[in-house]
Amino acid sequence: LSSAQDMTSLGISIGADKKVNENKLLGVVLRVGNNDVDVGTYGSSVDTNAISLSLYGSNSLNEDQFLDHIIGVSLLNSDIVRKNSGNTNTQTGDRDGKQIFSSLKFSREFEYNDMNITPKGRMDGSFTHLNAYTEIGNEAIKYNDQDIVSLMTSLGMMIDGDISLENSIVKSRVNLEYGKDFASSSKVVTRYTSDSYTTYSYQANKQDRDILTAGFGFDFNHIQGLTISADYQKQKIISEGSIDTLLLAASFVSKRETEYAMTLEGTDDFAVGLNVAKNINGFNFTIESNYTLMSEIPEYGGNLKISSKF
């Protein structure tokens, strides 16, 4: 199969959080989503439905120490169509899966002269189990159960400070980080249903990856409601290569308290985002849209968020 040609995503999230006390916030989010990916030139596709439940929290251990965490579970169902040569040779299948995921982040702030120095650490992990399934078709393939383990850790430091100007404030920042992506033992094992003696296997991500990240940026905030931001980040994957990312953003809050924002972000392909946000009768409405520029395969999306405090 060749690379993905088209992807359509649709999701609805419903959540709520509560401030338990001055130092703790807890929340829950339920998300139902669909991800439809067309693959290759013959019409192969993977249509996945997922339902996820996440619990999250944010804790202030004291005035300068913070702990954020999230844990969640997902149920997955995929309708798979594999085509080898146009519409004349089609295999179909249905695969179920389960996933558990979590993230833990710790940070501590230190003040030095006019700067804030924040050491931080993070750990992200997930375990996914995909059930075995057998295709239906003339060249059907049987796929064994598959377990996918993902684990990534990082340690870093953020340095930031404010510069006060007439009618405005400039906040600059520098970010340094070391991360490690641990290799997964996940293996895909298959065989053709017409040949029960020969099996095929494939294993990706066989080695650990060390990742170095450095970035800097600033925010310019004017009292008239204008905010301009810029960030540059370079990520070096040892023995593999590097990724450069640039983010430019601008927003303005009008006299009617409507916020308009535009972003430009990307590496080789830049994505443009346009957002509008407004509070109406205690409800925060946000409309988000994005479009990828200079890409052979255009990507575009839209999002509507509604939130309120009770």
Locations of regions flagged by a protein language model:
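Membrane translocator/pore-forming domains, dominated by Gram-negative outer-membrane beta-barrels
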Residues: 1-310
